[in-house]
Design a protein with these regions (language model features):
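Asp-box/BNR beta-propeller blade signature and adjacent active/binding-site loops
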Residues: 79, 85, 93, 110-113, ...
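Extracellular beta-rich repeat passengers
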Residues: 445-639
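C-terminal/domain-terminus segments
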Residues: 219-240, 349, 353, 550-569
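Short glycine/acidic-rich loop motifs that flank beta-strands on beta-rich extracellular proteins
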Residues: 128, 141-142, 163-165, 222-225, ...
Length: 639
């Protein structure tokens, strides 16, 4: 079934209540944890007896042993009328809120969009082949839309500059949405919508490739370039739509948008209490970034989630939806408006030797979502947000299931918020992720350090599950942030009374209460289990206040019961079965409390060194917590 039809069917048939977890009473929880020592011992025996989990990683890699094949015919864009452009120097943002000089196509440059589209159409019509973008500067006022059996290749020295004009990404889509433009089916932070086209786009295609000769083959999203004359909506460039550094009422994704009507106007007959629980207090629900998840939570079908003109949801740079047999290789991406790569519901996707260089807001490097069979190999990341963030939907948009069978290897993370991140949009679940031979280089450690190397982030709204995450052989030559960014619990929360470096400062972070105040519907307790991390090697840096590698070695913040606001009776499951072995975390700044645990059981440290001290022990800190008659109850901690 095509992607759009599947989404419609899903959203019409799944009620919100179907995503609720079955609740357990206090007695059930207590019985489940009566013999924590025995459970830990049994788990240790099971680990010894089971097969090597890394065999599955080898099987995933083997899926890519046979290269994709294409017809041996080239379709050069100059044969279809493309002409190169010249560049001029202008003022713009070189990174988020940092002004500098940028190269951009001169005003009046010839547009190569029609030629690229014609070359792809001709190639596809003949059964496939290779579309070649030669060396030179190319101005492209519209998206490159990939089609089955077509390989788009950038020659060495080919640089494609996508126009800094949102109108060009709202005039070629297959969904005519009137004043909002001709839009495409997209997914924005885990929720489906009709929106501006990404700069490179494909939907329901098979056997496709986007490649470059080397890292002089560049796709430039011009996220910090001022918008072209004639586009007057909102601030000055794509990155400004984030709302950072702008006057309070400037129209951005975080300012209430009058084009977003109340839910009872979109969903006639919606229960008033349900509407209130989704929208929350004030007008935050009316901002574009919150209105889309509200539409999902209310069960609004995708065809009625119309954004584009009049709204401020930035498109991804490269988004592939419902595709299989995909190769992304050998090019560089610069200055993306939003996430750099976003495959959704794709199968058998290989990204190899790609340089991801973008320091704008939300500049995640590679975000696979609801995908099965992904290999990330030999890539370089320097990003304004997470380098890699594995996702699987948000609210009710979980119909494509989990992301599973992902291998990440031989990569370098120069900078970013998180190195390898899972979430936060993970409502559909994540399982069987393998990461090895990684260098979290953290080159900007003096002034803009990596927040955390290995990170999971979810909460009672995102929910979902993470199971079977395996990480080994990673180095951190400059550690991570040594100044913490602390957890912000909901007002009145009582469980955690000490500072927790859940946002920045830990080398390993499992955060199951990520920014809980961002969501009004907190009804889906997440489940996190079966994680193994080994051979982590961390080096201290001279901070001027001492030689440190991090603030804390690891933070395991399990689900926080008081953040839940769903139906009474729901169990709040702990993080379970985490093993960290054969690792040296250097010297944390917080030597008094080198780690933090909350609601976590069977956490094994096996030959782990922190601040020169070796640890060989199993940790548990379980709040036996549940919800009774709408009130949070904390029985006691099992330490």
């Amino acid at each position: 079934m095509p992607f759009q039809a599947k989404r419609r069917a899903l959203l019409r048939s799944v009620p919100a209540a179907s995503l609720m977890l079955t609740g357990l009473g206090a007695a059930s929880i207590a019985r489940a944890h009566q013999d924590g020592a025995a459970a830990a011992a049994a788990a240790a025996v099971a680990r010894t007896a089971r097969p090597d989990p890394w065999q599955r990683a080898a099987d995933i890699v083997a899926r890519f042993a046979t290269p994709l094949a294409f017809r041996k015919e080239d379709f050069v864009i100059t044969a279809h009328g493309a002409k190169p452009c010249t560049l001029v120097r202008i003022k713009g943002q070189t990174e988020s809120l940092v002004e500098g000089m940028l190269d951009t196509p001169a005003p009046g440059s010839p547009d190569c969009y029609p030629a690229i589209a014609a070359a792809i159409a001709a190639c596809h019509a003949k059964g496939g082949g290779r579309v070649v973008i030669p060396k030179g500067e190319w101005y492209c006022a519209g998206p490159i839309v990939l089609r089955s059996n077509v390989h788009v290749h950038l020659a060495a020295g080919a640089r494609v500059h996508f126009s800094a004009n949102p109108t060009h990404y709202a005039q070629h889509g297959e969904h005519d949405c009137g004043k909002n433009g001709k839009l495409v089916l997209s997914r924005w932070q885990g929720n489906d919508c009709l929106n501006y086209s990404p700069m490179v786009y494909a939907i329901n295609q098979t056997n496709i490739a986007l490649t470059g000769e080397d890292w002089t083959s560049i796709l430039n999203g011009q996220g910090g370039v001022p918008f072209e004359p004639g586009f007057a909506e909102g601030p000055e460039c794509w990155w400004d739509w984030k709302g950072r550094g702008k006057p309070v009422r400037t129209r951005t994704e975080v300012v209430a948008n009058p084009n977003n009507p109340p839910l009872d106007k979109v969903v006639p007959g919606i229960d008033a209490r349900r509407q209130a629980s989704i929208e929350g207090e004030g007008d935050r629900w009316q901002t574009d970034s919150r209105y889309l998840p509200a539409l999902s939570e209310a069960g609004v079908p995708v065809e009625k989630r119309v954004f584009g003109h009049g709204h401020f949801l930035r498109p991804c740079m490269i988004e592939l939806i419902g595709c299989d047999k995909v190769l992304l290789e050998g090019y560089q991406v610069n200055a993306a408006p939003f996430w750099l790569h976003h495959p959704v519901a794709c199968r058998d996707l290989l990204i190899r030797r790609v340089n991801m260089e973008s320091l704008g807001p939300n500049s995640d490097g590679f975000d696979p979502e609801a995908c099965d069979g992904v290999l990330v190999d030999d890539c370089l990341f320097n990003n304004g947000d997470d380098c890699i963030a594995i996702k699987s939907g948000k609210n009710l948009d979980t119909g494509h299931g989990p992301t599973r069978n992902v291998v990440i290897r031989n990569c370098v993370m120069n900078s970013g918020h998180g190195g390898v991140t899972l979430g936060s949009e993970m409502a559909g679940g994540i399982e069987h992720v393998y990461a090895e031979k990684l260098e979290f280089r953290n080159i900007h450690w003096k002034n803009d350090p990596l927040n955390t190397a290995i990170r999971l982030k979810t909460n009672m709204n995102r929910g979902g599950f993470l199971r079977h995450l395996y990480v080994r052989d990673v180095t951190l030559p400059h550690g991570v942030a040594t100044e913490p960014m602390l957890y912000k619990p909901l007002p009145g929360a009582r469980e955690i009374r000490e500072p927790v470096a859940s946002t920045a400062g830990a080398i390993i972070t499992i955060d199951c209460d990520y920014v809980p105040g961002d969501d009004t519907m907190r009804i889906r307790p997440p489940q996190v289990s079966d994680i193994e991390i080994s051979n982590v090697r961390t080096t201290n840096v001279d901070t001027g206040k001492g030689s440190f590698s991090c603030y804390q070695a690891f933070v395991l913040l399990g689900p926080v019961a008081s953040s839940y606001n769903g139906k009474p009776g729901a169990a709040i499951p702990p993080i379970a079965r985490v093993r960290i072995s054969d690792s040296d975390f250097g010297t944390p700044r917080n030597t008094a409390k080198p780690w933090f645990l909350h609601n976590a059981v069977d956490i094994t440290l096996d030959n782990v060194t922190i601040a020169g001290k070796r640890y060989q022990q199993t940790l548990s800190r379980i709040g036996l917590s549940f919800i009774r008659s709408g009130q949070f109850v904390n029985i006691f901690y099992l330490a």
